[in-house]
Structures are given as structure tokens and as C-alpha cells.
Amino acid sequence: MLSSLSPYMANPRNTLSQVLNFGLVLSSAFMVWKALSVITNSASPVVVVLSGSMEPAFQRGDLLFLWNRSPRVDVGEIVVYNVQGKDIPIVHRVMRVFPDVPTTGAKDVEGVEASQKLLTKGDNNLSDDTELYAPGQEFLDRKTDLMGSVRGYVPAIGYVTIMLSEHPWLKSVLLGFMGLMVMLQRE
């Protein structure tokens, strides 16, 4: 088995170049992700629909593009939010917008900054999302809970992410395959 690696050990400069190329690809992907985060003002500018709660608008596995620079959210808009204490983004439609409620600690020119409050519901669900919110939470806060509003989507391409989440061993296989391809690449 080690004899098959001998051509790569004979030329360490070429091997180092291939490893650096692999690192360059990974760091470039990271920089693109961070640039998208800054442009969209969202920590996660691209998310995958994980359930069927928004059918027929979005199917499980659809890839959504978010925008979080709008100062307000309107009724009927599809938003992505995180529930406090959980790390799974939820994609649902805004059903009701409550009057702006002053937040504590944050002040603007007039003295108190208001934060929009929202009630959401999945298109394919029978009831609103109050059961999904954190205990004691009756609505979402626009500034703290929302990741962004959906501005576009690509159908079904997110199934790769779902497969990697549901079958963790696939991550190892995929990373190993990518590393092997970089190492076996001839220039």
C-alpha cells in the first residue's frame, strides 16, 4: 500500500503544491461565504429547506437565498428564523406583524428604538409557530430572531446537505475522495 504513495514522496515539492492548492480551494470557498454574509447581512445567507412545512411553495431540499437588509418585514413574506436555544433554521411565512415594541437598552435619536414583532406559520401546517418558539416567547423579534427573508431559490440542490446530515459517514467518504483527487491530480 505504501508503495503506491512512493511517486508522491519522490517529489515533495509537487506534493506540497497539491496540498496548498487544496487549502486554497477551501479558503476561497470560506471567503466567498463570508463575503455573502456581509453583503446580505445574514450569518447564513444560504439555507436548505429541511422539512415539508412550506409545501407547495418550497419542497424539502430546496436551496434558499436570504437577504436581511430590509428594515421591515411584511405579512406574507417568507422568512428564515432561529429559535432561541436551537440551531436549526426554520423557513415559514409571516402571518401577522405586531406594532413595534420598544426594546430595552437600545436607543435611537428619539430615545427608544422599536423592534418589529412577527408571528409565523408554515404553509403546510395547521397552526401558527407559537409552539415552536422558545418557552415563554409569543412572537419573533425582527432584529434578534430573523436570519433573513427569502429572495430566491434553487429546487432540490440542497438534498446533498440533507444526505450528509442524515448519513454522517458520507462526510468522511466525500472528504476522503476530495483529498484523494487533489493528491492524484497530475499537472
Curated annotation (Swiss-Prot):
GO cellular component: signal peptidase complex
Bilayer topology annotation: Single-pass type II membrane protein
Positions on the Lumenal side per record topology: 40-187
Active site: 53, 92, 129
Transmembrane region(s): 19-39
UniProt xrefs under CDD domains: S26_SPase_I (cd06530)
Reactions accelerated catalytically: Cleavage of hydrophobic, N-terminal signal or leader sequences from secreted and periplasmic proteins
Biological process terms in GO annotation: signal peptide processing
Keyword annotations from UniProtKB, A to Z: Endoplasmic reticulum, Glycoprotein, Hydrolase, Membrane, Protease, Signal-anchor, Transmembrane, Transmembrane helix
Main localization of the protein described in the UniProt heading: endoplasmic reticulum
Region named C-terminal short (CTS) helix: 173-184
InterPro entries, A to Z: LexA/Signal_pep-like_sf, Pept_S26A_signal_pept_1_Ser-AS, Peptidase_S26, Peptidase_S26B
Uppermost EC category: hydrolase
Membrane-side (Cytoplasmic) residue stretches: 1-18
Enzyme Commission number(s): 3.4.21.89
Coiled-coil zones: none
Cell location: Endoplasmic reticulum membrane
NCBIfam families recorded: sigpep_I_arch
Domain characteristics, as noted in the entry: The C-terminal short (CTS) helix is essential for catalytic activity. It may be accommodated as a transmembrane helix in the thinned membrane environment of the complex, similarly to the signal peptide in the complex substrates.
Family listed: Belongs to the peptidase S26B family.
Record's subunit section: Component of the signal peptidase complex (SPC) composed of a catalytic subunit SEC11 and three accessory subunits SPC1, SPC2 and SPC3. The complex induces a local thinning of the ER membrane which is used to measure the length of the signal peptide (SP) h-region of protein substrates. This ensures the selectivity of the complex towards h-regions shorter than 18-20 amino acids. SPC associates with the translocon complex.
The protein, known as: Signal peptidase complex catalytic subunit SEC11
Gene name as annotated: SEC11
